[in-house]
Every structure is written in C-alpha cells, then in structure tokens.
Amino acid sequence: MKTIILFFLIQGIVLAQKPPYDVFPDAEPPYYRVRYEAKQVGDLAFPVKFTIWIPEEVNTLRGIIVHQHGCGEGSCKSGLTGAWDLHWQALARKHDCALMAPSYEQPQKANCQLWCDPRNGSDDAFRQSLVDLGKLSGHPELATIPWALWGHSGGGHWAGGMVMLHPDRIIAAWLRSGVPYLQTNPDRPDIKAHQLPRQALEVPIMCNLGTKEGYSDKSGRFARVWPANLAFFETISAQQGRIAYSIAPLTSHECGNQRYLAIPRF
C-alpha cells in the first residue's frame, strides 16, 4: 500500500512540472534542490527550483555565488544545470562558497517581470530556499552568509534589484545585458523603478553587455540594452557608487565569453 501511495505522489510531482522544466539532473550530495509551486512562498507567479552545489571539503561556507538565468523558456531551462558548471564551481571552491542556480518555470510568452522583479515574490522564494537548503544540506549558515550575484538579461534585472533591496547582504553583482530601472520609463510602464538606497552605492557592480546591444549597433532587437545600462551607470556613478561597465566586442545579447572576464574579477 505504501508503495502505491509513493508511486502516485511521485507521479503527481512529475506531472506538475511541465516541459521543458520536467527534465533535469538528479540532485545528489554535494548537490541539493528545493522546489516551490507558484504562490507557495509569497506572491511568486511561477514554480521555481533552487539547486545548490556545496564543496564537500568545506565545513562552514563563507558565501553564495548565484548564477541567475534570463527570461524565456530557453534561458530559464538553462538554470536546471547551472549548478553543474565547472568554471563557476572552481570559483566557488576557491572562496569556500556554495554555487546556486535557480530555474523559474516561466512559460515562453509570460511576463518575465513576474519573477525578474524580485518584489514580485522571487526575493521571498530565494531567501526561503536558503533556509530550506540549509536544513537539507546541514549548512544552516546558508540563511545568513553573503551573496555574490551574477545575472543575464532578466537575471541581471533581478540581481540589480536585489542590490537595491538587500545591499547589506551582497558582496558584488555582475549584470550581463540587463539592469533594473532607477527611473520610470514611459516606454515600459510594466517595469517598476527601484529606489536607490545609500548602502547600495557601496556594492561593487559591473554592467556588462555586448557591443551589438545598442552600443555599436543602434538598431535591432536589443538596441535598448545599452541606453538602459548607461542610465543605470550614470545614476549610480553620479553618487560616487562603486560601478563600472564593460563592452564585449563580439556579441549581442548572448553571453559569449564574458565568463572569462566575470569569473576572475568576482
């Protein structure tokens, strides 16, 4: 009887995860995973998985490196394997850190702001995952140690938004091809501006984007990325914030080889 009940429970879990989010690696130690349904934690509109890798030789973690995907099914799906990235694992191991990769189960045509604005529930889900993963892994310090945030596109928007909400928790942030708004944009009324707290000026931030995202190529799908990055940079630098920008010379919105700049400087 117990076997039958367990079978149907497993089937229910599998059926609840729709393609392309239903195929992912098993999380066996040193990997750990938690998953929340939509609205299970706060107001988050979509289900989400948080997978973390913890170096086995580390007794007490010093921080968490968060690798945050962007918008759309293809990018969100990449978060399912992000914790297995050997380059980022090497960086995490070097600093006695964990490596986390969230995966928001956003339908392709859904509004990305429903998760990439952390005020829409992803902040609450992220912080709850640290508590739950701390219990699961035997590393309760996950709930309190600082974060280094890397995000691409909508993930950059999310990481930058977290800097505004939790500057006291963040060591550094790398925003690839995406930043939050600090002023209202009448062309994007669906995106709410963040307040810029004084403490956020102390967080080192790198804005990194491809040259074809409006820097050298002023037309095309991603031409608005550079103006948004420039406005974000100028607002923070005008108040002596710790911010810089870098232009990848060969790319558009794809990540390209930016990791070879990001990882050594994180």
Walk through the language-model features, giving the residues of each.
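The feature captures the conserved acid-bearing segment of alpha/beta-hydrolase catalytic domains
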Residues: 171-260
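Serine-hydrolase-like catalytic core of hydrolytic proteins
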Residues: 70-72, 95, 123-124, 148-150, ...
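Short substrate-entry loop that stabilizes the transition state in hydrolases
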Residues: 58-109, 182-183, 215-217
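Catalytic active-site module of serine/aspartate enzymes centered on a nucleophile-bearing elbow/loop
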Residues: 262-266
